[in-house]
Design a protein with these regions (language model features):
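C-terminal accessory regions
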Residues: 100, 251-315
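AAA+/P-loop NTPase substrate/partner-engagement loops
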Residues: 13-38, 51-60
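Accessory C-terminal helicase-associated subdomains
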Residues: 161, 165-258
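Short glycine-/polar-rich loops that comprise or flank the Walker A/P-loop
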Residues: 15-16, 96-98, 128-132, 263-266
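Hydrophobic positions on the alpha1 helix immediately C-terminal to the Walker A/P-loop
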Residues: 3, 7
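Conserved RecA-like ASCE ATPase "motif II neighborhood" in helicase/translocase motors
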Residues: 37-95, 250-253
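A short beta-strand-to-loop transition that corresponds to the Sensor-1 phosphate-sensing loop
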Residues: 25, 71, 96-98, 103-116, ...
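Conserved coupling/interface region of RecA-like P-loop/ASCE motor cores
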Residues: 103-184, 188-192
């Protein structure tokens, strides 16, 4: 996202007709609010150049000089809610002279996510568009600690890496807490020190609907009874503000309100949607305990695919 934003700014300075495209609406809204810093005029201007991905299906060919798509792995296929086109990847390619896709295949988390590297390349070739690949070597959100990211991927059995036994501990801080209360105290301490810090969880608990009395995080859905712990998911109203509003720092974020954002510290609660099977020595997703209704569509009898998405969420 840092690279994407720098490219975006340079293109704006060069006078190009460019838009910053963010498929995740929470990520886009948080970016606009942070950059506008409570200034209405600035927010109105930013809203014109920061966009979701649903509108380009009706754009005339080559309407834009450049479209920069951050978190492009979350671009959607036909049939997605409120999207009337056939392929958001193809929409972007057709609508712009140059399209830049920032992609991480291992952050695809739903069956209708279509923005994989292979798919983008295939659609580009279909539309006679030249493809230039650039590999970004380090994770900014992990202080450049590639070893830690590789260890997480190996531990979750996403892929085998050379970091199966750990990473350089000086490069990245990682702790396992005994209770959710201990985790919460640690994150709160970091917040008091001026760090950006939040708690997130896997989608292993239901999210009470607005019509059932939960428009603004009134219901404590995330419960761990054995520890007497209960906290609300992020508010359904202005969901993205959970990440930037200190009055909502007690709320628990989910993948859909946190993906793409960076924090100094993050606490992760693992739920029953993921488990280790000692008989097969495998880490798997659990369909019954995974509560993202859209994320599990068509996956009841596809345990490997379900597990891949759930492990990507925790990654």
């Amino acid at each position: 996202s840092v690279v994407a934003m720098n490219v975006f700014v340079d293109l704006l300075k060069a006078g190009k007709n460019v838009q910053f495209v963010a498929p995740n609406s929470s990520f886009k809204s948080a970016m606009i609010d942070v950059l506008a810093w409570h200034k209405v005029e600035a927010k109105n201007r930013l809203t014109k150049i920061f966009s979701g991905a649903t509108k380009f299906y009706e754009a005339p060919p080559l309407s834009y000089d450049v479209l920069i798509v951050d978190e492009a792995h979350r671009l959607k296929a036909k049939g997605t809610y409120m999207y009337k086109g056939d392929s958001q990847v193809e929409d972007v390619i057709k609508a712009s002279r140059v399209n830049v896709f920032f992609i991480d295949d291992e952050q695809m988390i739903r069956p209708n996510d279509e923005g994989s590297m292979d798919y983008v390349e295939a659609v580009a070739k279909k539309n006679h568009s030249e493809v230039i690949k650039v590999h970004l070597n380090a994770q900014f959100r992990c202080s450049g600690a590639d070893g830690f990211v590789s260890w997480v991927e190996h531990t979750l059995q996403i892929r085998d890496t050379a970091n199966f036994d750990g990473w350089d501990k000086k490069s990245f801080e990682f702790k396992i807490m005994d209770t959710p209360q201990e985790l919460e105290r640690y994150i709160y301490k970091k917040q008091c020190n001026g760090d950006t810090a939040r708690i997130v969880a896997g989608f292993a608990w239901p999210w009470t609907a607005t019509k059932n009395g939960n428009p603004d995080a009134e219901v404590a859905d995330v419960t761990i009874p054995e520890y007497g712990y209960a906290r609300p998911w992020n508010s359904r109203h202005d969901q993205y503000t959970w990440a930037i509003d200190e009055t909502k720092s007690h709320q628990i974020g989910c993948i859909h309100t946190s993906q793409g954002l960076e924090f100094d510290y993050i606490g992760v609660i693992l739920g029953k949607d993921i488990y280790y099977d000692p008989a097969t020595h495998t880490i798997n997703g659990d369909y019954a305990n995974y509560y993202d209704k859209t994320g599990k569509v068509g996956l009841k009898n596809k345990p490997d695919e379900l597990s891949r998405y759930i492990k990507n969420i925790y990654r």
